[in-house]
């Protein structure tokens, strides 16, 4: 089971990036194969306040590949402590 280990928005984003990269790696892919990211966030204010740290961890973990992205503000996520969930779509060549 996946548990949220921190209430820090930027740290939750970094963990989400590590999770995405791990799944990509299991498929023989990397960040360059990402074509779309949809972020579900619970707080516009925390997102805005954390942009610099989130951007830095994205580049460090995923790389300097920037697919199409959308950010959706939601009332809540399944895990009560979660502040961000990232849905990723990748295209991996045969």
List each model region and its residues.
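Short, polar/acidic, helix-capping and beta-turn segments at strand->helix junctions
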Residues: 1-94
């Amino acid at each position: 089971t996946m548990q949220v280990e921190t209430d820090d928005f930027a740290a939750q984003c970094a963990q989400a990036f590590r999770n995405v990269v791990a799944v990509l790696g299991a498929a023989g892919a990397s960040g360059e194969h990402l074509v779309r990211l949809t972020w579900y966030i619970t707080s516009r204010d925390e997102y805005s306040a954390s942009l610099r740290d989130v951007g830095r961890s994205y580049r460090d973990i995923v790389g300097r590949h920037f697919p199409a992205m959308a950010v959706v503000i939601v009332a809540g996520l399944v895990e009560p402590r979660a502040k961000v969930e990232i849905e990723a779509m990748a295209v991996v060549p045969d």
